[in-house]
UniProtKB/Swiss-Prot annotation:
Disulfide bonds: none
UniProt entry keywords in alphabetical sequence: ATP-binding, Chaperone, Cytoplasm, Nucleotide-binding, Stress response
Cellular component, GO annotation: cytoplasm
Chain segments carrying region A: 1-359
Protein name: Chaperone protein HtpG
Localisation per UniProt entry: Cytoplasm
Gene: htpG
NCBIfam families noted in UniProt: PRK05218.1
Taxonomic classification: Bacteria, Bacillati, Actinomycetota, Actinomycetes, Mycobacteriales
Annotated region (B), positions in chain: 360-575
Superkingdom of the organism of origin: Bacteria
GO molecular function list: ATP binding; ATP hydrolysis activity; ATP-dependent protein folding chaperone; unfolded protein binding
Amino acid sequence: MSAQVEQLEFQAEARQLLDLMVHSVYSNKDAFLRELISNASDALDKLRLEAFRNKDLDPRTVDTSDLHIEIEVDKNTRILTVRDNGIGMTRAEVVDLIGTLAKSGTAKLRQKLHAAKNLKDTAASEGLIGQFGIGFYSSFMVANKVELLTRKAGETAATRWSSDGEATYTIESVDEAPQGTSVTLHLKPEDFEDELHDYTSEWKIRELVKKYSDFIAWPIRMEVERRAPATSDGEGADGEEQVTIETQTINSMKALWTKSKDEVSEDEYKEFYKHIAHAWDDPLEVIAMKAEGTFEYQALLFIPSHAPFDLFNSDAKIGMQLYVKRVFIMSDCDQLMPMYLRFVKGVVDAEDMSLNVSREILQQNRQINAIRRRLTKKVLSAIKDLQAERPQDYRTFWTQFGKVLKEGLMSDSDNRDTLLHISSFASTHSDEEPTTLAQYVERMKDGQDQIFYATGESRQQVMNSPHLEAFKAKGYEVLLLTDPVDEVWVGMAPEFDGKPLKSVARGEVDLESEEEKTAHEAERKEQEQNFAGLVNWLKETLSDHVKEVRLSTRLTESPACLITDAFGITPALARIYRASGQDVPFGKRILELNPNHPLITGLQQAHENGGDDTHLRQLSETAELLYGTALLAEGGALENPAKFAGLLADLLSRSM
């Protein structure tokens, strides 16, 4: 006997999201069956793992003797049921499942879905559904009503959930139900134009299982009709066929990672990737490997073609599954791949490891650490091959995952050289095409022994920075690094191919040849003499802001710029450290002056001429404005915008 039925409303945002997903997102409605089978497979994996780890499970309430997935159809009522006898769910977990839709029903997801729809980007929109983990609701594409009945293994109470996909759903406790979960779909009528097929048809079910779920490790069973002609012993009179019902397993259950690459079709790899990654895009690269010797294991890895929405979330998971002798152990096994390769999806099947292994044990496991090192090198090698042999695919990869891969330049010193080789960067060499460091080195000017780079928030900001002026004038290529991670890794990767990496905004800049230095030596000494008074006065006047004032060799157009010591912390890097909770003291920088700029020569003349108190005050205000404009020119933020605006207004008023 069931308890009272509780009827609840979907949140308004959840209704909008469900409606958008069902009617606008999926281009292929057949995919609903893959989602349901994938969920059932996960439930069976979890129960088998629990049985390995907990030997005290009560056999009266937990049955692991015949774990399987069952598909049942009723042609007359047009009902399709997908059933498993896996781990099942409690009422609280069912409510949380409903909450998944509500929690995923955010403005962010809806905006992305709308954008993908408007751009007619089917792969992107379907990918979002897999990423947000709400594929269960794809059932409403083909069904007018969906019912879920579930009982947690080891529990006695069951739960029934039901909805028509509109405004409400119902949930109730049920006294009796088999272990596991069944999802029952009351199918919509067939509609050829809307691509609604007959999902009660045996051949259609077989087709979809073969296409999407043939590799599932659990048997997928279905009752099928077998017809035989009438026999001569009188049975089947009047020429009627004999109809028998038999249960058949309709999937092969062969683990793809145990096969050699030439035994697996491209489509099989694609569907397996979509299954384990809960993704809708095709993989960009498939990596199959088998290791023998001290540590034996097989691995099947995939590099996606699209970045997941949560790639940069602090709680982003590593999409690696661990098996031991074909037995599922855990998903999201973060010990199998470094965090900077968290976009890689795949399976590792080890031969010599305890089935009772836990995440805590894995952290100290020598075999896992060795596997991790080998997998890392294999993935990086595959990316290197993409770069050399399939440049367009590499470009796609770098666009999607370049930012996260560069995290490895900070954290993985063992593979830093490889990472530097497979990384690409924007540069002043081309507005469109990124460059590798090896290509940069090939183009270096005669006598150049450093790789120059500039950091900032955008290409436009960096290109307009005064720090680049001398480099542009003399034709030196500069890398344009605009990702936040760039500020950090450049300090940890000091050189490439024996060439030091040099910031255009740090320390001294020396771009002149020996001949040029000799020719300009007299002029430089004269300038230092002429501007000595101004330099000393500015250092004193701006002592709250700068530690030093000097003439610049990097400026050709701007009057001044701010630079950091060769080993100092840039303001952008300081902001990153502070955002992560580190206490970084304010560091004064160096103000460089362009001795050939009219503003600087005019300021020098005004300082040399002297004057009354009003004149000196106005001169000091001009110095403050000079500092502020240098800060703004590099994309920095003013310490006191109101004060700067007031000084600027006064100056403009005097010039009227």
